[in-house]
Amino acid sequence: MTVSPFSQPLLRDKQEALDIQDLQGLVCLNLKVGSIRVFSGFYTRIDQVFILWGLICAGIFLTAQFLAISWDTQAIWWSTLTLVGSIAMVVLTWFWASVEKVRWLVYCWVILMLGGVVLTDLSIFLGWGEVLMRLCPLWLGLTSIGYLCTVLALRSRAFLLMALIHLLGMAIIPYFSEWQFFTTGLVMMISLLIMAELQWDMRPPIDSDLLTPEQKLFNQHQNQRRQLADLQRVKN
């Protein structure tokens, strides 16, 4: 008996039965003060990418909101940071995306991020006032497109929810007047950190020629463990 993907919660506590592609580069944190555990968690490379972009988004939009730094200087700083973030994203996600057969999704996100940077820089250096006044809706819109592409790739309702949140933000952000950058940064950062901290739903595992027979067998066992846990949750 298998569990339908639609029976999975959109978001839940992380499952510990991870596949090979998720175990690659796994970071485990166990912070203690004396004998008291303050925080414990683990982060796959995909989670690490979410955290990275969450911090980048916070840095970019909160700086634009609160610090008196020229637009030209910000454009140079944030273009460089976005380029570094895009390269890091490719490096961290490439094996996972290859196994899951969604390399095109990585390309999509890179194109969206770099395309957004180009539009932002042109609006600043060439004085495109109409674009400059709509940078927040622009970035919320680009991010929602990325999430929708992720929905197509992974059949995930959690990413659909994130896409809808960003589309809603795109529609209402003009009403926040002087707090547009703060609100945009907050929406993007919190969304990314939620996806990094929790387990999101996705389509069933697929067979990959990149894995050895032993790795495929390991993934099958891990999938069975996850299905058993899901069945127990449904029964309870």
Residue ranges of each PLM-predicted region?
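N-terminal juxtamembrane cytosolic/stromal segments of multi-pass membrane proteins
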Residues: 1-46, 229-234
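Selected alpha-helical membrane-embedding segments in polytopic membrane proteins
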Residues: 36-117
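Physicochemical signature of membrane-embedded alpha-helices that form the seven-helix bundle of GPCRs
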Residues: 52, 135-142, 184-187
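Membrane-embedded alpha-helical transmembrane segments of multi-pass integral membrane proteins
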Residues: 56-60, 85-88, 143-146, 169, ...
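Hydrophobic alpha-helical transmembrane segments and adjacent interfacial helices
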Residues: 58-66, 114-126, 146-148, 166-178
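Membrane-helix interface and helix-disruption motif detector
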Residues: 65-79, 124-135, 175-184
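Terminal transmembrane helical module of multi-pass membrane proteins
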Residues: 146-235
